Regions:
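Flexible mid-to-C-terminal extensions adjoining Fe-S/redox cofactors in radical SAM and related proteins
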Residues: 1-40, 353-443
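A short acidic, helix-capping loop that chelates divalent metal ions and anchors anionic groups
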Residues: 94, 185-191, 259-262
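Radical SAM enzyme [4Fe-4S]-AdoMet core and its adjacent flexible, acidic
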Residues: 195-199, 211-408, 412
Length: 443
């Protein structure tokens, strides 16, 4: 329901009473995102085949509405830190979970055998995945199995302290370092990580820059209201200043996995729309609230590709309220152009989706390709593009943004492409079953 321009979730439990929580702090952006709600094709060979009610038989199950776009595979629950804020509750379970190399391979094979779309991307997590004894071997095997995008979610200690380990990981096929990054002050890390960590983060960036063919870095800030929301713009500037190796930022508003009273919940709760509003304010309008779109906004591109090529393609049919993102073209920290400034996103995606439905019913695919190109010419304004880009080179960048070719394409242009987004993990206070059914990031 809406209250004072905010979207509030209210629940009533016979045993535990009334619960109220802000899920989005801006109803306008919430309603805009709802326009991009799509049900996906699910999984043809789920682990649970006869589930009756979601989420009682979670698995993946036959009721799930999205295939796996990104898999998170925990290599261990051990960690080389003891953070007060820890999504995985690492080192606190009282036992060690650490699958053998063969077990990890079997899990990866299950993901690659998923139908009708094989899982294209994998992120190794934990605990701290880089302390797994056969980490480099796992990266090599993931590459061998055909994962197009291989990531690791890390605190950065191993990559900061052992350059040869970083080099071996990169040479094995590591594409992206998802680097925990809560701010540019050790005062923040003392609260969030119980130790100074800023020097470690700087060292990771420095070491990655030394590599001949470096993986991309994505900064992953956990945002807690009252702790570090004032760091959003400084972190954004840091990413721009280091855009030769930092290719993205993925903010994660804090999820409350333990007990918390109502006052503390309201005090510390931070939503995706808070992020969009704060970034606009802190950058003085350089990145506006209107530049953000939900993850499934790109579904029409996938459905059109599926219709034209005749085979299912990766489709991000997450719930429209799970994540927000925008793409930026960056020349330097002072020259940034959001993609939305030269692409009319909403009408373009609407017409592409309508075209995909027509293409599904047509045996002749060439007219659909020609129509798609005419739509792109209609809604992409070359006069507003970054200098050095035209429609064709821009389309090549988009088509290769998930692969190594994107770096080669961008190297010919003075502008770099950067992803800025946010994904809000659910907790008991904002749990939404409709989000769960459509989740495309599977553990």
């Amino acid at each position: 329901m809406e209250k004072d321009g905010k979207v509030v979730m209210e629940k009533e439990c016979p045993e535990h009473g009334h619960f109220s929580d802000i899920v989005w702090s801006d109803v306008e952006l919430y309603l805009k995102s709802e326009q991009f709600a799509f049900d996906g094709i699910g999984v043809e060979n789920p682990f649970i085949t006869n589930a009756k009610v979601c989420p009682n038989d979670c698995g993946l199950c036959n009721l799930h509405l999205s295939h796996t776009s990104l898999a998170n595979l925990d290599l261990t629950n051990r960690c080389n830190m003891k953070c007060p804020i820890c999504f995985a509750n690492a080192n606190a379970s009282g036992y060690v979970y650490e699958p053998s190399f063969d077990e990890v391979v079997k899990m990866m094979q299950v993901l690659r055998n998923s139908k009708p779309v094989a899982c294209p991307a994998i992120q190794f997590a934990g605990g701290e995945p880089t302390i797994y004894p056969q980490f480099v071997d796992v990266i090599k095997k993931a590459k061998e199995l055909g994962f197009a995008q291989i990531q690791v979610a890390t605190n950065g200690l191993m990559f900061a302290n052992d350059f040869e380990f970083l080099k071996a990981s990169a040479e094995a096929g590591l594409n992206t370092i998802y680097l925990q990054f809560d701010g540019l002050s050790d005062d923040i890390y003392m609260v969030s990580r119980a130790r100074k960590m800023l020097e470690v983060k700087m060292k990771v960036v420095e070491n990655v820059r030394k590599l001949n063919n470096p993986p991309s870095i994505v900064l992953v800030p956990v945002i807690v209201k009252g702790l570090n929301e004032d760091q959003i713009e400084p972190m954004f500037r840091f990413a721009l200043e280091n855009s030769d190796v930092i290719r993205g930022m993925n903010f994660q508003p804090v999820a409350f996995t333990g007990r918390i009273n109502k006052d503390e919940l309201a005090k510390q709760r931070y939503t995706l729309t808070d992020l969009a509003i704060d970034l606009e304010a802190q950058t003085k309008g350089q990145i506006k609230k209107e530049d953000w779109f939900p993850v499934p906004s790109v579904v029409p591109i996938s459905t059109l590709a599926t219709a034209i090529l005749g085979e299912p393609k990766v489709t991000f049919t997450t719930h429209p309220h799970c994540g927000l993102a925008t793409y930026l073209f960056v020349q330097d920290k002072d020259h940034v152009i959001p993609l939305t400034h030269f692409v009319d996103v909403e009408p373009l995606f609407k017409e592409l989706f309508e075209l995909s439905k027509k293409a599904e019913c047509s045996k002749l695919k060439l007219p659909s390709k020609m129509k798609a190109y005419s739509l792109l010419k209609k809604y992409i304004h070359e006069d507003k593009m970054p200098e050095g880009l035209d429609t064709m080179s821009f389309l090549k960048l988009l088509s290769s943004v998930m692969g190594d070719e994107s770096k080669q394409s961008l190297s010919k242009c003075s502008w770099k492409m950067m992803f800025v987004g946010g994904m809000h993990f659910q907790d008991l206070y904002n749990y939404d079953i409709e989000r769960v059914k459509r989740c495309a990031i599977h553990y």
